[in-house]
From Swiss-Prot:
Single GO molecular function: molybdopterin cofactor binding
Official protein name in the record: Protein-methionine-sulfoxide reductase catalytic subunit MsrP
Post-translational modification: Predicted to be exported by the Tat system. The position of the signal peptide cleavage has not been experimentally proven.
Main localization, broad class: periplasm
Family, as annotated: Belongs to the MsrP family.
Highest rank taxon of the organism: Bacteria
Length: 331
């Protein structure tokens, strides 16, 4: 593939800039959430879903606010990454290969109206518009670690609901063994599609038990507001014990299939990107050690890297799914 040399250069891995902005205090973020929730309660008729729907129709910052209660089961005893870093340091190749490209170029994405087709081995296939999807289950905030295969990480306060809630409603058949996620591929909205980096559209997949795991989050917000375009608006999946590329963005199709689906990076380089791609400090990528990581906005070039945790620190939730598997073979 002609793009390989360029792509490898783009993935050099040590292009992490120092942040000049102090991360927002966690208490300040909580205060905003509580204020938004209080305003919604005072209104009587306006809840989290109403706020979200208004936000997609308006570029106004206040309208983009999204109230959701914090789930105390899902917190991280570490500093939350700043909103600036979360929204300006991204991998979203549909908008370019530089980390700053999504923030600069994703304004062309139109997140509303939006439809997600749920299809395949299910008894109740359905096409959800984003408004209906937002009303499917109660929203909550979860603070998760995000670990990129390139050796950097963040701590991010996502808003969404368990993917399992959607799965239960569509009733998978006994033939459904895997779930595939397909991202929008519209050249008029995504200028990066002109580069033959991957076989578009971008797709990812999970085993059914992984998709049903309580950690797997169908995500529509971050940092107390609806997802910015560069972070995968209007809906993405977050799988916190896997490397970031497994968490598909701007989803338009969710397919239930009977066999392991092709996924974009695994198809591109199966010896480098496994289907499972669980965070594992004992299995290195050919170009990046996975034993340690640099926290964006917090760990400078001269700060010792922090040790990477097995399953990104979520072993109590997920390790049993891989009992007996050779995780070096099934990486």
């Amino acid at each position: 593939m002609l793009i390989k040399k360029t792509l490898r250069a783009a993935l050099a891995g040590d292009d992490i800039p120092r942040s000049e902005i102090t991360p927002r205090a966690v208490f300040e973020h909580r205060r905003r959430i509580l204020q938004a929730a209080g305003a919604a309660a005072a209104g009587g008729l306006v809840g989290a879903h109403g706020l979200a729907l208004a936000a997609y129709a308006s570029p106004d910052a206040a309208a983009r606010k999204l109230a959701a209660p914090a789930n105390p089961k899902f917190v991280v005893p570490e500093k939350v990454t700043s909103f600036k870093d979360i929204t300006t340091y991204n991998n979203f190749y549909e908008f370019g290969t530089d980390k700053s490209d999504p923030a600069r170029r994703a304004g062309t994405l139109r997140p509303h109206p939006w439809r997600v087709s749920v299809e395949g081995e299910v008894r109740n296939p359905k096409v959800y518009d984003i408004d209906a999807l937002l009303k499917l289950a109660p929203l909550e905030e979860r603070v998760y670690r995000l670990r990129c295969v390139e050796g950097w990480s963040m701590v991010i306060p996502w808003i969404g609901f368990p993917l399992a809630e959607l799965i239960k409603r569509v009733e998978p058949t006994a033939n459904a063994k895997y779930v595939q996620f397909v991202t929008l591929a519209d050249p008029s909205q995504m200028p990066g599609l002109s580069a033959p980096i991957l076989d578009w559209p971008y797709s990812e997949g999970l085993r059914m038990d992984e998709a049903m795991n309580p950690l797997t989050l169908l995500t529509i917000g971050v940092y107390g507001q609806v997802l910015p375009n560069q972070n995968g608006a209007p809906v993405r999946v977050i799988v916190p014990w896997k490397y970031g590329f497994k968490s598909a963005k701007s989803i338009v199709k969710i397919r239930f299939v009977d066999r392991q689906p092709p996924t974009s990076w695994n198809t591109y380089a199966p010896n480098e990107y496994g289907f499972y791609s669980n965070v594992n400090p004992n299995v290195d990528h050919p170009r990046w050690s996975q034993a340690t990581e640099r926290r964006i906005g917090e760990d400078g070039f001269f700060t010792p890297k922090r040790k990477t945790l097995m399953f990104n620190g979520y072993g109590d939730w997920v390790a049993s799914m891989y009992r007996g598997m050779d995780l070096k073979k099934y990486f």
